[in-house]
Amino acid sequence: MTNIRKTHPLTKIINNSFIDLPAPSNISAWWNFGSLLGICLIIQILTGLFLAMHYTSDTATAFSSVTHICRDVNYGWIIRYMHANGASMFFICLFLHVGRGLYYGSYMFSETWNIGIILLFAVMATAFMGYVLPWGQMSFWGATVITNLLSAIPYIGTNLVEWIWGGFSVDKATLTRFFAFHFILPFIISALAAVHLLFLHETGSNNPSGIPSDSDKIPFHPYYTIKDILGALFLILTLMLLVLFSPDLLGDPDNYIPANPLNTPPHIKPEWYFLFAYAILRSIPNKLGGVLALVFSILVLAIIPLLHTSKQRSMMFRPLSQCLFWLLVADLLTLTWIGGQPVEHPFITIGQLASILYFMILLVLMPIISIIENNMLKW
């Protein structure tokens, strides 16, 4: 008799995705982040669900409802801080996952890569709207500044912004709709993640060497299930260290001040994971130009596969490209630092140089270096 695991329509899908899935024998810990992102998403949905049971999306009570969750709800404080810091863990895993894709040439799976970019945009939108919900100073002014960027769109901009706001400023209508979208988007993200996996399993995983591994596959279970569990333990350990020892380390103190439309904070800045994009936005003195640069800073990932000029898929055996990749990482860290600094000399100049370098590396230097490396193979 055949095992029900392999015959039942539901278990068959799980079996082919997580148990009997043929996986390359040499994938490293950099391949753990897909499963870690899945765990992050589950943590965020569960903690978010329990927070939504006690949260009120009304400007008069939103701030005090969050306070109520932390003070009066059983273990409300831990749920709230797991949700807030879970977002940070989510983005750490996301950036490492995308970085892995860039380094090892995983972007050659174009469907998987493109859905990944859509997922990145969806997660960023969700995180932005979630940051507005506690209705602190940074929530209110962050929402005002970022939504206002849409007014740079010619002709329809102003109408579009007022339509999103549901009025002439960020107010009760904005908060209510942001809560609705923040609640529904993670489920859309879950569906997209399933499609992301579907496309990945059409081709099978890439591996560090970038060489096809069809001749050397091992079953996902037990080899990679145990490896993923180890990664998950590290993730949960890091998250709980953050939550239990310094829950406000990555937050902004201004968000403990209730939203006040009459008082602008001295430095409006988003959460740390958006600072690199915020720095790129601010580095261009023109409003529309800044908005385009902001969108393109993520959208540039979509044209990476078209700019792949190397004869090798992975960077494993390409030392010059490796140097350029780590320069890109350093540049992104610089942008993240600049995004959190005030708009004054020398930060403006550093931000502009770092922004130019970011696009230069991805669009110009990477393809050129790859061609040089191709020629070096003939030496």
UniProtKB/Swiss-Prot annotation:
Its cofactor is heme b. It is found in: Mitochondrion inner membrane. It is a multi-pass membrane protein. One of its GO terms (cellular component) is mitochondrial inner membrane. Binds 2 heme b groups non-covalently. Its main location: mitochondrion. The keyword Hydrolase does not apply. It holds the Pfam family Cytochrome_B. Component of the ubiquinol-cytochrome c reductase complex (complex III or cytochrome b-c1 complex) that is part of the mitochondrial respiratory chain. The b-c1 complex mediates electron transfer from ubiquinol to cytochrome c. Contributes to the generation of a proton gradient across the mitochondrial membrane that is then used for ATP synthesis. Belongs to the cytochrome b family. This is Cytochrome b.
